[in-house]
Amino acid sequence: MKPLHLLTGVLLAALCLPAAAEDNTIDPALLAVIEARDEDDKARDQYRHPAQTLSFFQISPGMTVAEALPGGGWYTKILAPYLGSEGAIYGVNYSDRTWPMFGFMSEDTIKTRIASTGKFPGMVGDVTDSGIEAAGFTFNTVPPELSGTADRVLFIRALHNLNRFESQAGTATQALAAARSLLKDGGMVGVVQHRLPEDAPDEGSDGSRGYLKQSQVIAMLEKAGFELVASSEINANPKDRPGPEDIVWRLPPSLNGSKDDPDKRAAMTAIGESDRMTLLFRKVD
């Protein structure tokens, strides 16, 4: 009889999606960049595992990387200095018409968000003086000269809202088409996404609550012309078991709905940031 742990391993291999082999080798240069950030940014590392995540995505200095929805630049502050002067980084944002769809932003806020796209190179310049090439554009305004130049496109906690407005405006389709256009032949897409359990009702997986199912994301990328290369549990959090009405923003760092309730806040803080899938895809013909 085979040992139980071997049988378990065989069963998992049969049931699970392709998983990356664990490789504890992380570029010391990447670790140095991560360590050099301010303490507020580093406080999130225990949940976001940037060194392991970027290593899993096989990112290295000199690459051209497009970051979808860079926001305040949490990952930009790592990528820009790490890619270095021989690399390039692009910040790719929602199309201008997407912002009003959220329904809760004032006109001034919408204008600020739209303007932030063009300010991405300035953000990069504030992070590093290496002279790295930087550009900011939207999913529907990819510069033709950048087509086929990217080694990686990253969707880090970015796909839920793109899926949320897919039926209304084709936002996910547009974003993945932009990714495919940007990538070199054989280039890869890295995904980190809040994960809804596979046995949860589908109503919670439209993106409006922040969560998507892993099978749903894989199908979405495959339909757009990518193949799954590997999956990882780097960013998994088994403590996060969302109920039918739970939103991802109930958890840190947002803590929506509990900031004035110490007990609820403590409970959400104890869970930590969300359970997340980490997936790597390759562009295929």
Predicted feature locations:
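C-terminal lobe and adjacent flexible extensions of AdoMet/dcAdoMet transferase-like proteins
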Residues: 224, 264-285
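Conserved beta-strand signature within the Rossmann-like core of class I S-adenosyl-L-methionine
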Residues: 186-194
